[in-house]
Every structure is written in C-alpha cells, then in structure tokens.
Amino acid sequence: MKNVIVWMILTVWSIMNVTAGDTVYLFSYFINNSKDGLHLAYSYDGLTWTALNGGRSFLTPTVGKDKLMRDPSICQAPDGTFHMVWTSSWTDRIIGYASSRDLIHWSEQKAIPVMMNEPAAHNCWAPELFYDESSQTYYIFWATTIPGRHKEVPTSESEKGLNHRIYYV
C-alpha cells in the first residue's frame, strides 16, 4: 500500500502547469521499456491526454550503462529553463540530466553521479526534481537499493533482494 501511495504522489508531482495563453497540464513519460526516450503529453483537464510530437520521442537517451530514459521528471526554473532528470540504467549509480528552453531542443545529456560515494549501491531509480522558491534551491529525490544496509521488505517476487530507500541532493 505504501508503494502505491508513493507512486501516486510522485505521479502527481510529475504533472506541471505551463501557461501559454491557456493553462494546460504537461506530463512527461516513457514507453517501450524506456529505451525510446522522452515523451510528452498535454491535457486541459487532467483527465484526457494528447501525446505531443505525434507520440514520438523528443530526446533519445545517451547516458548510463543501459541508455534508458525512464521516469523523466521536468521542472521549470524561474528563468523559464526546463530541467529534467531521469533513470538512466537498471543498475547504475547515476541519474541523467538535460535542460531546454522550449522542451524541443535539449542540452547535451549529463550523468549526475549521485551515489558514487556508495560502492554497494545497486541503482538510482525514479528521480524527481523540484525547485524551492523560498530557498532558491533545486532538490532531486530518488530511490536506491544498498544491499544489506536496510531491512528487506519485498512487496512482490520481483522486489526480492531490493530494499529501496529515498535519497536526495
């Protein structure tokens, strides 16, 4: 149940408001097990969604062992720049990063080594990016498994051996 609640919260946080005449919701997502890249959809009501770019990817992943672009999280900075982080591999200690002024043309992709100080870290999954206006600080939260560090609480057969905990920078 806790996993479902966390998933729902992270999904809602992934939706952001963009103003360009009318207010719309923008949703970033992945398809085909995330090797395809960044996909975007919009909605006026949060219920009916339309894929942008004909459903094609806006950005193909180039960083990480597996070159994935899973769980993309986009945040708009006060200067209008969009910053994005994503899961870049199944078993890497990095997350991907890129920025854009228009959500179409993206900067060179970079690997952020968020768990390099933890040699036993198994992964860095589902990063979420936030900007706190009061402190003018960006925060990135993600889930990582460090075998033997925390009690294992598998919620399904596929979760065996994983003990994800939330970390942030």
Residue ranges and their predicted role:
Residues V6-I15:
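Bacterial N-terminal signal peptides
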Residues V18-V169:
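Carbohydrate-active catalytic/glycan-binding domains of CAZyme proteins
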Residues M1-V4:
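Positively charged n-region of N-terminal signal peptides that target proteins for export
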